Amino acid sequence: MKQIVYAMQFKGKAAPGASPNVMKAATSAASNTLTTVVGADGIYGKFEPAPGGKAQFESEVTLTGATSFLEKGTIRFGDGNHRLHFSTVEHGYLGDSADPKLKSGAVMWRVDGGEGQFAGASGYITSNFTLSDAGEVTDNHFGVIFVR
């Protein structure tokens, strides 16, 4: 088995779904590099553009409580048929943040398989995200994926 490790920042929208407790998320991320520097002033990090294609993310979020949710979806990497399918491990969390216009949350997803490069894939992806009052999503992923 081979490991693929990635970090990407997805941006897009969340909108109401088919029922009152369901949302649909659609985001995308360009190829990037993540720089993290630790120094005398503390820590600094940023995503910077890199040559390459985009990843497309689509999911369905089901709210299960005041701050909890379940999620399942797909991430397509590039223009080919390289897709990951994922679902929530236990529950995700979405709550208030220090910015009154933003909700903030985190979730861990299990890779349930995939297609193309990800056929038979397994692993986990963590997501730390914000959701604005207008439905704008910024979603930071860190994934460790096992492929054949």
Q: Where are each of the predicted segments found?
A:
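Beta-strand-enriched cores of mature, soluble protein domains
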Residues: 1-148
